[in-house]
């Protein structure tokens, strides 16, 4: 069975990922399009299903979906799996799924449905007008006088666009089927499919986070930046020492240090020759430009209700075939140079927001 769905959620999937996307209270599946055994594509308008005593297409879809013997195909199957699992409150075992996107990436094709269609010169191409339809129906809209102050567009607000949205979902299934047929001469080995299944279980399980550590790290970062800004203003007398233009002028005119820019490598190089206030200011500049806390912000954005963050890895995400990081980029964590004992104490101090004690321990 080939599947494509259209959904709505007030959570921004580009910021929070598919798993938290489905946790929004207003998350729902709007349209399901599917084909069984290469047959005609059926489209289910989910806004009407609850109002009908029996919906033949929907019942047929559920029978196939819940049958472990039926292989389910989708382009970026993780999204369909995650959304359908939430909708039915039932697990969607990855062992039953095939990801056409991953299988395309395995043979050097792009990771987007429309790009793959273009490269393969398929007769059926993804409808490029779909992005506008997604913006209209799948994400909140800005309240205006013209739209009556509403924050969401429903089918009744534009029936013509809604029918176009249904047709767009059908077209996506057509393209996905055409891609699967086109790449069938490059079969996926059993072991590679098993690796993808493992990957899905890893992403589904996620990683447990410490909410108090994230909060403490963000508070510490804010406090540290405020203190550094205070020091910078005192040293330079500038209204905004964060401004590259102001700081470069101060370094040149008042300190005699003609530095071309404030990029990290440049600052590190000029620190070797700087003295006095100029040296202190460059040291502060390096501290102020640190971005490690952004990972904590991303963790917060992606954290699910059970305080786990999911969907952190993309199978075959790189052209070489290796995994690629998504969201938090766990494979790229900052390296530390303190002992395990100091690290454990530091974590506890950050959780408790005892920053003066942390400063004594690590001189931060």
Regions found by a protein language model. Give the residues of each.
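Cytochrome P450 core scaffold surrounding the K-helix E-X-X-R motif
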Residues: 10-14, 43-46
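Short, conserved, GDST-rich strand-edge loop motifs in beta-rich repeat architectures
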Residues: 17-19
């Amino acid at each position: 069975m080939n599947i494509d769905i259209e959904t709505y959620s007030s959570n921004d999937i580009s910021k929070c990922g598919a798993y938290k996307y489905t946790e929004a209270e207003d998350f729902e599946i709007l349209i399901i399009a599917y084909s069984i055994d290469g047959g005609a594509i059926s489209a289910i308008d989910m806004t009407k299903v609850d109002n009908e005593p029996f919906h033949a297409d929907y019942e047929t879809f559920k029978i196939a979906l819940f049958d472990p013997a039926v292989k389910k195909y989708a382009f970026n199957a993780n999204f369909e799996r995650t959304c359908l699992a939430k909708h039915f409150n039932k697990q969607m075992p990855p062992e039953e799924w095939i990801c056409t996107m991953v299988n395309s990436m395995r043979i050097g094709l792009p990771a987007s449905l429309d790009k793959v269609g273009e490269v393969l010169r398929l007769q059926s191409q993804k409808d490029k007008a779909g992005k506008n339809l997604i913006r209209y129906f799948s994400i909140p809209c800005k309240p205006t006088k013209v739209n009556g102050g509403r924050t969401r567009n429903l089918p009744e607000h534009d029936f013509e666009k809604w029918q176009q949205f249904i047709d767009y979902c059908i077209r996506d299934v057509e393209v996905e089927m055409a891609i699967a047929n086109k790449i069938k001469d490059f079969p996926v080995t059993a072991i590679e499919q098993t690796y993808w299944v493992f990957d899905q279980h890893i992403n589904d399980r996620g990683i447990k986070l410490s909410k108090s550590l994230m909060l403490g790290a963000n508070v510490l970062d804010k406090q540290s930046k405020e203190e550094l800004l205070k020091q910078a203003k005192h040293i330079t007398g500038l209204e905004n020492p964060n401004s590259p233009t102001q700081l470069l002028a101060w370094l040149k005119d008042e300190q005699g240090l003609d530095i071309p820019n404030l990029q990290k490598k440049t600052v590190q190089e000029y620190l070797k020759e700087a003295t006095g206030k100029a040296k202190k200011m460059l040291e502060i500049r390096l501290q102020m430009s640190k971005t490690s806390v952004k990972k904590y912000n991303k963790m917060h954005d992606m954290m699910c209700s059970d305080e786990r963050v999911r969907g952190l890895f993309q199978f075959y995400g790189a052209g070489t075939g290796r995994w690629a990081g998504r969201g938090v980029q766990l494979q790229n964590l900052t390296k530390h140079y303190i002992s395990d004992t100091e690290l454990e104490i530091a974590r506890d101090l950050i959780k408790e927001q005892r920053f003066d004690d942390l400063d004594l321990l690590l001189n931060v």
